[in-house]
Amino acid sequence: PFTATFFAKHALLNILTRYCVFDVEEKLLVMRPYQIVATERILNRILVSENNKDMLGTLRAGGYVWHTTGSGKTLTSFKTAQLASQMEGVDKVMFVVDRKDLDYQTMREYDRFEKGAVDGSESTAVLARQLANPDCRILVTTIQKLACFIKKNKGHEVYAQHCVIIFDECHRSQFGEMHVSITKHFKNYHLFGFTGTPIFADNAGSGRNFNLRTTEQAFGDKLHTYTIVDAIRDENVLPFRVDYIQTIRERDQYEDQKVYDIYREGAYKAAARVDLVTNYILDHFAQKTKRSHGYSFKGTRVMGFNSILA
């Protein structure tokens, strides 16, 4: 079945011409099957909604891809942006990342994929010029810079153009005011998100905007899934073991009350909890990693100390 599918003329031609990438070290990267499928789902959604103008500018024109951490989301999402920019009728493709993710190495990688697409400056002036330039069909920007541009340019011509906006790591940072700004100003848009940790109703927690609490509410349908279970099965990521440790004990003197949610960040970062978790890790490190006595925390410290004195 693999050879019949892989070596089919149209499949092999697509892989060679559309789904291969050279990185900054001139290394040839061939996209994996799940990456190709996710890309095709997005391109198909763009094509369908372009032929149905009622879908443009709505959630039905977009969607999100759930690919686990370590499965190559950034390559998939950027290659999707590159191919989308080549589609007839698409004016602009914006590949949006968080500021903290746009380091020098990442910029080199993006620039390798699309020369001149990425701008690492803090100024929105370059972004404004890129958006106004009809020859600049694909660009990489940050969430923060795009938000600043929208705030300063209320009547920009790009808002009326056919735009594809792709978010890499579409977690909570895209919710709220940023999402509202995009959907309010852009008229003919497709909104796509890539995430390894989608937010569902049962893990959404509290938020100011009840209509944007989940990933689906912000981006639309789930277009493709490749979870950690799939990645471990395919040996694309290392397997791991999870031990659940009880950190909260019920007390009889407290009466249960129904609340919408708790202050999770405060609970997670409480000094007492952090201290207990840290001590547990140190105390059980050798046991969990199956190290010998000589490599225990105490043994390592003593041996290192002696070697320094020697």
Predicted regions and their residues:
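Short glycine-/polar-rich loops that comprise or flank the Walker A/P-loop
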Residues: G89-D91, C136, Q161-H162, F186-H190, ...
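Conserved helicase motor
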Residues: V97-K100, G120-R129, I143-C148
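Conserved helicase ATPase motor motifs in RecA-like P-loop NTPase domains
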Residues: T68-T69, H171-S173, H185-A204, E235
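Conserved RecA-like ASCE P-loop NTPase motor core of nucleic-acid helicases/translocases
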Residues: W66-H67, D91-R99, S296-A310
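SF2 helicase catalytic motif II
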Residues: H156-F192
